[in-house]
Amino acid sequence: MNKDEIKNLTALEAESELEWLAKEIARHDVLYNRDDQPEISDAEYDALRRRNAEIEALFPELIRSDSPSHKIGAPVSEKFEKSVHAQAMLSLDNAFSSEDICEFIVRIRRFLRLPATQILEMTAEPKIDGLSLSLRYEKGRLVCAATRGDGYIGENVTANARTISDIPKVLRGEFPDIIEVRGEVYMRRENFQALNMSQQEKGKFVFANPRNAAAGSLRQLDPRITASRKLHFFAYACGEVSETFAASQMEMMKKLKEYGFFINPLTKSFKTLEEIISYYHDIEECRHSLSYDIDGIVYKVNDLKLQMRLGFVSRSPRWAVAHKFPAEKAMALLEGIDIQVGRTGALTPVARLAPITIGGVVVTNASLHNEDYIKGIGHKGESIREGRDIRVGDTVIVQRAGDVIPQIVDIIAEKRPKGASAFVFPHLCPACGSHAVREVGESVRRCTGGLICPAQAIERIRHFVSRNAFDIEGLGKKQVEFFFHIQDEALCIHTPADIFTLQRRQEKALVRLENMEGFGTVSVRKLYNAINMRRKVPLSRFLFALGIRHIGEVNARRLAHAYQNYTAFETVAMAATMPYDKVGEEGNEAWLELTNIEGIGPQVGEAIIDFYQEAHNREVLAALLREVTPLDEENVMTASSPIAGKTIVFTGTLARMSRDEAKALAERLGAKTSGSLSKKTDLLVAGSAVGSKLAKAQGLGVEVIDEEAWLQLIEGSYI
């Protein structure tokens, strides 16, 4: 959508577009910042943010409370302790042309009211494509290392950071009592290639690029793994400091080097726009000769007092900007289209290319995104590439942007061979043969064989045993992978039922489990006890554990409350499939009954139908139900509940229960829960280490209580 198209939007269209953008950008923030698994290139992500900003500029009255313009990064993972940043760890605004940089400098001069004759000195440094890290030193000793997280709360990765040789454990020379040093953790290309070769030889996960490898390596639960990954660190700024120790950005860098940090040797200062742009082009030209990936240049006002005067906007400093490199392109022959099945069942087309070199990297595969993209249709149903589809045998234009997975952006129509036929996207999963369905409004086709599909199996079993599902202690990620890959059929776990037959089957094992490395008599006994304790679970947990698309904890509880027992639910789910096979009153009534439950609409109903229509899933379910019993759901009376009908938001860390447990409890007592604050919020329950929600709640006039008051409020209302 270009600027002219944005200007023609109605208020209703703009509101719908902003809602979609908020959700889409938030999803990609989590994929990039928390999961280290980006689906789109930096250029595509930047385009989404630009579109959001342009629509907000035209319709300021429609700016949402969850607008991406106000957010940084993504929420932290539950795997790590949280660490509150003493000074917010913001991201940078992006620029894409010399004109953008000129405007950036003009804005600074205007804000500071600088006369045209006054020189504005700027620093320039390569923008390292890695993971931002904040290092806190007290009395010269490293006491905390934290990732950016959402900009206010990060993940405490101190133990892992200590294994990186570039990060000093004790500072040298004279330094402030308290100093937070910000910088970038990265992996050199040669180390990245060696790591991937090692991963491949061991049959383990292969990283898409050095940035993902660095982020994944730093965020390991075992510091020994981080230590083995050869990570590096460049310092580029400071957060909180107890005393001033430099007058300029360049002096700060010099001091940090004296303290023992590595500073990028390409960092320089300039006095004119022409010098800055010349530096940008020089670095762009030689970027592939560097030992690490960069995706642009960062410019900063050199004078630290001017930085203080300029301050910040909602998610970035006024005194700095990232000048991004353009995407690199090349032509290639499309030799084939392969379909990969992801851990969530999504069928993703991948282009097989005749080898080409883009930016010094040999490319043989490229992303084709989804079924519509191949046909020449965009995410909103609009025509892309002037409606040209992509066919095997085409000469295609491949783009590599931000050092993420390359993608095909267009074809050379005149080079299409005669007889090239349109690509037919499969309707059956290539991994298990189950039906692959595409929901209305979705661009992705997904495998419905969730409980049987080998491509999804490990992730499905991990979900099945997770804390909010069957909650089986002793079956973590490593154990699930061990039992899935083991060659002995007497010990393998490929379906949920296999978990509950393991103890019986192991009698026929070639080697008993307690005699294997990593296990022992005590740990095996504990594992079997944990499994047997979960042979009876509440219906809501059972439904959630099945991993049916759109059936999260909330919808699982809704269905459990509506049907009370599994037999009643299964009867309706099976009956609702009947309209697919025959037209009948029973089927139609079952469909209406299912989809008229509050919060359960056609989209969720279709997901349930798809799941129960698949014979593979019914077979796996039947085997599971021979081993476990879903307990009937008890009605929860909410008439006397003090929070019935109220909208509640939870923030911070709760001591007596997890936030998920608190939300579930509130909903059982008749309240609605939300992840974001608005004027409709009745109550904010604040734990420790709260972020920005507290101030926002006070601004909106929302009542705020702590965890103790929350427990007193609901005392006697639940068992």
UniProtKB/Swiss-Prot annotation:
Required co-factors: Mg(2+); Mn(2+)
Pfam short name (any one): DNA_ligase_OB
PROSITE patterns for this protein: BRCT, DNA_LIGASE_N1, DNA_LIGASE_N2
InterPro entries, alphabetized: BRCT_dom, BRCT_dom_sf, DisA/LigA_HHH, DNA_ligase, DNA_ligase_AS, DNA_ligase_CS, DNAligase_adenylation, DNAligase_N
Source superkingdom: Bacteria
GO BP term, example: DNA replication
Binding site for Zn(2+): C429, C432, C447, C453
EC number(s) from the headed UniProt entry: 6.5.1.2
Active site: K127 (n6-amp-lysine intermediate)
Gene3D superfamilies: 5' to 3' exonuclease, C-terminal subdomain (1.10.150.20), 6.20.10.30, BRCT domain (3.40.50.10190), DNA ligase/mRNA capping enzyme (3.30.470.30), Helix hairpin bin (1.10.287.610), Nucleic acid-binding proteins (2.40.50.140)
Every BRCT domain range: 638-719
GO molecular function, one term: DNA ligase (NAD+) activity
Binding of NAD(+), residues: D42, A43, E44, Y45, D46, S91, L92, E125, R148, E184, K300, K324
Protein family (similarity comment): Belongs to the NAD-dependent DNA ligase family. LigA subfamily.
NCBIfam families: dnlj, PRK07956.1
Function: DNA ligase that catalyzes the formation of phosphodiester linkages between 5'-phosphoryl and 3'-hydroxyl groups in double-stranded DNA using NAD as a coenzyme and as the energy source for the reaction. It is essential for DNA replication and repair of damaged DNA.
Protein name: DNA ligase
Organism, scientific name: Bartonella quintana (strain Toulouse) (Rochalimaea quintana)
Gene name for this UniProt entry: ligA
